[in-house]
Design a protein with these regions (language model features):
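Short beta-strand and adjacent tight-turn residues that come in two discontinuous sequence segments
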Residues: 99
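Acidic, PIN/NYN-like endoribonuclease modules and their adjacent C-terminal/linker elements
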Residues: 45, 105-163
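Active-site-proximal, substrate-binding regions of enzyme catalytic domains
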Residues: 1-94, 102, 113, 153, ...
Length: 163
C-alpha cells in the first residue's frame, strides 16, 4: 500500500504522542522532501524533529516533476509540502494521501486522489482496536485544544461514530 502524507497530520500525531498509529495502520508512510524538511528543520521543535528522524517507517521521497509542483502552488495557493504530497501521490498512484488542510483536500479530491486526515486515521485506529473510544475521544480533544481546527460539530460527529 502506498501512503503519502503532508506535514500537518504528522504534527497532529506528534502532539498526541501517537506516531505509532501510522506505523501500525500503514507500515510505511512516504514523506515528500518538502514535507520531511518542514518536519525536521524547524529549530524551535527539535524534539519533534528528532522523533520524525527516528521513525524508520517514514521514508523521504522525491517528486518527479517539480514543474507540476510549481504550477500547482501558483494555481491553488497551496504550500510546497502540500503541493509535493499531492503531486507525488498522483505520479505514483498512491493508495492514500493523508492531508488535513481544506484547500489541499479539495485539490486532491478534484484530482481523484483518495484522501484521509487525522480524524479519519483516529477513527480507523479505533475500528482496528488500536484506540478504544475513550482514548480516541481524548486524542481528538487534545488536538482541538492544540488549535488543530476541530469544530464542536466535528468533535460531536467523531464521538457519535466511534465504537
Amino acid at each position: 500500500m502506498i501512503v503519502v502524507s503532508d506535514a500537518t497530520p504528522i504534527i497532529s500525531f506528534l502532539k498526541i504522542n501517537r506516531l505509532d498509529i501510522l506505523n501500525k495502520l500503514f507500515g510505511e508512510v512516504l514523506l515528500p522532501e518538502a514535507v520531511y524538511e518542514e518536519l525536521t528543520s524547524n529549530s524551535t521543535f527539535q524534539e519533534e524533529a528528532e522523533q520524525v528522524r527516528a521513525c524508520e517507517f517514514f521514508k523521504k521521497v522525491s517528486v518527479g516533476n517539480s514543474e507540476t509542483v510549481d504550477m500547482l502552488m501558483r494555481v491553488t495557493g497551496l504550500d510546497l509540502g502540500e503541493s509535493e504530497a499531492i503531486v507525488y501521490s498522483d505520479e505514483n498512484k498512491s493508495d492514500l494521501l493523508i492531508v488535513d488542510e481544506v484547500r489541499a483536500r479539495h485539490v486532491a479530491t478534484s484530482m481523484r486522489l483518495r484522501i484521509t486526515g487525522t480524524i479519519g486515521i483516529l477513527t480507523a485506529a479505533n475500528e482496528n482496536g488500536l484506540l478504544n473510544k475513550d482514548e480516541a475521544i481524548e486524542r481528538v480533544k487534545i488536538l482541538r485544544m492544540s488549535n488543530r481546527h476541530i469544530s464542536e460539530t466535528l468533535l460531536n460527529s467523531v464521538i457519535e461514530n466511534l465504537k
